[in-house]
Curated annotation (Swiss-Prot):
Protein name (database record): Large ribosomal subunit protein uL22
Family annotation (PANTHER family): CHLOROPLAST 50S RIBOSOMAL PROTEIN L22-RELATED (PTHR13501), LARGE RIBOSOMAL SUBUNIT PROTEIN UL22M (PTHR13501:SF8)
Gene3D superfamilies: Ribosomal protein L22/L17 (3.90.470.10)
GO molecular function terms listed in the Swiss-Prot or TrEMBL record: rRNA binding; structural constituent of ribosome
Function: This protein binds specifically to 23S rRNA; its binding is stimulated by other ribosomal proteins, e.g. L4, L17, and L20. It is important during the early stages of 50S assembly. It makes multiple contacts with different domains of the 23S rRNA in the assembled 50S subunit and ribosome.
UniProt KW Chaperone keyword: no
One Pfam family this sequence matches: Ribosomal_L22
HAMAP family: Ribosomal_uL22_B
Amino acid sequence: MEVKAIHRGARISAQKTRLVADQIRGLPVDKALNVLTFSPKKAAGIVKKVVLSAIANAEHNEGADIDELKITSIYIDKAASLKRFTARAKGRGNRIEKQSCHITVTVGN
């Protein structure tokens, strides 16, 4: 039994989020939540919400026992970027890309 939760369009870059995802891949959910709780990174809070959602999906939809669950897969995909301009000297402008990503977490036995 595998249950997944997806967060689409998270407003943080995929590169920064993958650093957090690599730390919890394959861990039991209780240890993964512990790692995410004490991580100082912004991405840890976002990934933690997705992991909690996947746990709730497994418990509610499949009637799974939380103690037996582990993170079977977690992957981060790049999403659409927001294009913005910032003013520079002499009437010029520079383009800024605000990155976003899709977070997919799968939990199972």
